[in-house]
């Protein structure tokens, strides 16, 4: 049953622990990625990314319920390091107990809206082929599979 009211807001520095936890949840749901790169290498990459986030934050949004409980998060990283970003790569995680209740749909919609306003040409993501629920969510939002990288499916939403 969908959560009736999902509140979305920009993430702040205070949200970094939650953002990290949600992205780590998404990584753990990706056995293909874990097997290919190894937990240690992924942890090292994540540590470097989040330590730099405080000084140069990428866009990120959190979803809350009406009581202020954090439900999920989505991050956007530029696909190319330039002033005119053509594509944003998203990473998303939703608390286990509220998956399938519309939180992810709201977060993905907000990321697409952000990218449109920013003038990007597309939004993309990488998803484990075994994560069929996530694939269905992204397809429902209008993403299409465009290839693979490191055995993960690349999905894209053209703006």
What role is predicted for each listed range?
Residues 14, 18, 70, 132-133:
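Short alpha-helical
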Residues 3, 25, 121-135, 139-159:
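C-terminal "cap" of GNAT-fold acetyltransferases
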Residues 1-17, 21, 159:
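Conserved N-terminal entry element of GNAT/NAT acetyltransferase domains
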Residues 10-13, 25-33, 37-97, 108-110, ...:
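Acetyl-CoA-dependent GNAT
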Residues 100-105:
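Glycine-rich acyl-CoA binding loop
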Residues 3-6, 87-89, 120:
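Short, solvent-exposed beta-strand edge segments and adjacent coil->beta transition regions
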């Amino acid at each position: 049953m969908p959560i009736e009211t999902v509140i979305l807001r920009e993430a702040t520095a205070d949200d970094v622990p939650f953002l990290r936890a949600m992205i780590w949840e998404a990584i753990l749901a990706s056995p293909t990625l874990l097997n290919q790169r190894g937990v240690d290498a992924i942890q090292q990459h994540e540590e470097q990314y989040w330590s730099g986030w405080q000084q140069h934050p990428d866009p990120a949004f959190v979803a809350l319920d009406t009581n202020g409980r954090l439900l999920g998060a989505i991050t956007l990283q530029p696909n190319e390091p330039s002033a005119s970003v053509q594509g944003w790569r998203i990473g998303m995680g939703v608390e286990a107990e509220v998956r399938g209740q519309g939180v992810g749909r709201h977060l993905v919609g907000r990321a697409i809206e952000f990218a449109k306003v920013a003038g990007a040409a597309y939004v993309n993501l990488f998803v484990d082929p075994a994560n069929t629920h996530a694939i269905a969510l992204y397809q429902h939002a209008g993403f299409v599979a465009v290839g693979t990288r490191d055995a993960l499916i690349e999905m894209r939403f053209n703006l």
